[in-house]
């Protein structure tokens, strides 16, 4: 598997304060998750999503390479595998990846590996940061190679031979917030917890409402759902 050199553990801890954002992502994942499916959290981090999902979906496997994060996942009783290549071909019903693909230099190789491991008819969900003009020191701090557009993300997934079932943007207000962060950025790449909480509590719900109008052309994140042809 292509190496993932992750340097953003502190960012994961900070993002735990974004309750509405995390609830949104969890709901996003659960839309396609069924209790009897084999599910893979690709880049499970500290278990923010795999932990709650495992309470009702016992066939979930966490893919994680960072030793510290692996230990955190195992302490929650989660099944952890370091390399997706270790799983049998065509064994996965549903794979989701949240804010991970941007960390991988050869994203096309990873998408091809997903295709190999997902069963025919199986589904994937990919959630990534959007728009290169929003690239900040925070992206650099946590090891992002790029940000995506709907088009560029779709291209990577289609090249792996998946069929796209939906693609859209999320968090329209987050575009303005990120531009403000970029304008005030002093290069540290850190997240202000107080400002994050304020945004998550008051702005993110508004953003979700506006997203119904803007989802096809603007948003801080890009989302793709796809299926492996049967």
For each predicted feature, which ranges?
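Conserved N-terminal segment of class I S-adenosyl-L-methionine
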Residues: 1-98, 108-113, 192, 197, ...
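A C-terminal cap/extension of S-adenosyl-L-methionine-dependent methyltransferases
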Residues: 5-7, 171-230
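Short, glycine-/aromatic-enriched active-site segment of Class I SAM-dependent methyltransferases
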Residues: 12, 124-146, 150-156
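Helix-to-beta-strand junctions that scaffold the AdoMet/dcAdoMet cofactor pocket
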Residues: 34, 104-105, 118-120
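Residues lining the SAM
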Residues: 98-101, 127
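Conserved S-adenosyl-L-methionine
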Residues: 162-172
